[in-house]
Structure formats: structure tokens, C-alpha cells
Amino acid sequence: MELSPRAARNRGEYKRLSIYTIAASILAAACIVALIFTVWFTAVIIDDRGMEPTLERGDAVLCDKLALTFSSPKRGDMLCYRAVYGGGVYMGRVVGLAGEEVAINGGSVYINGCLLKEDYITEACPVDMESITVGEGMFLLLPDARSSMQSTASEELIISAERIIGRVAVRVAPISSVAVFE
């Protein structure tokens, strides 16, 4: 059955509109994804060995910038934070919270005099640290690879809340090691 000229014209216009609708939908979805990643996440490539074995050099992670808007960091959280000088981004694990007294003695971390159990640590810390009290709005962060610590200078370990970028949420690369962190 042959279509009338008007029906053939309508069919052609319908196909053209369908292509535009699909293209507009894809563009809108791409814009929404870009907006979410700009506002919600920061991508970071690990360039040192400080968080091994949890995160290795060359891993790509997404730091959730909004997670800390609704809750404070907890002990054990992995955080991305801005360096004091040079503008670099570093990673560390929350060990000490505001008001706590933290010491490192004989390779072990003590919080308010009690030994901190850390399942993610494979090597003891090679340096001792006198007991220090973490100030209000501050967090004491340590690397997982404690054997790489050369210093326990508090200005390097105690991070203000303003310097925190976000909580490490997902390892996205390499693909074989994709993981979600809680």
C-alpha cells in the first residue's frame, strides 16, 4: 500500500524529530552527569604510596564532597585534603578526633591512653609521637603505610575541617580494582 504524499512527508518529519529528541536527551543527560560530578565529586589520582595497601600509586578515586556536609568525619574514614603549601591534594585516614589525646608509641597509636585497633595497617609506625590533643574543628590523619612516615610534626598530621575536600568514596581505576568505600 502506497502512502499519500502528506503521510510520507509526516513520516519523514517524525523520523527527523525523533533523532533530535534522542540527541537532546543524550545532551541533557551528559550535562546532568557533568553537573553532578562537578558539584558532588572530585577525582584524584594517587601519586604516592602513603595509603598502601588500601590505595596504590596510580589508582583513581572519587572524593565525595557532599558527604561531610551532612556528617562529620569518623575514625577510620579516608579523606582527601588540601596541602598547606603548594596546592597539592593528599590522602589520609582519620585517627584522632577533636578533643582526643593521641600518641604514637612503639609503632602503635593510642587514643586517650587506649590502643587503637587498626585492621588496615600492615606495618608499624617507625617514629614515636608525644601525646597531643586534637583541637576543636581539627582531625589527626595518618597514612595507612605508616612505615613511610618520616615525621610526626603536628602541622603535617592535624588537618582543619576547612582543608578537607571530601571522603574517599570510590576507587574507579584500575578497572580490575574498582571498590566502594564506606
Locations of the language-model features?
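Extended hydrophobic leader/signal-anchor segments used for secretion and membrane insertion
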Residues: 1-182
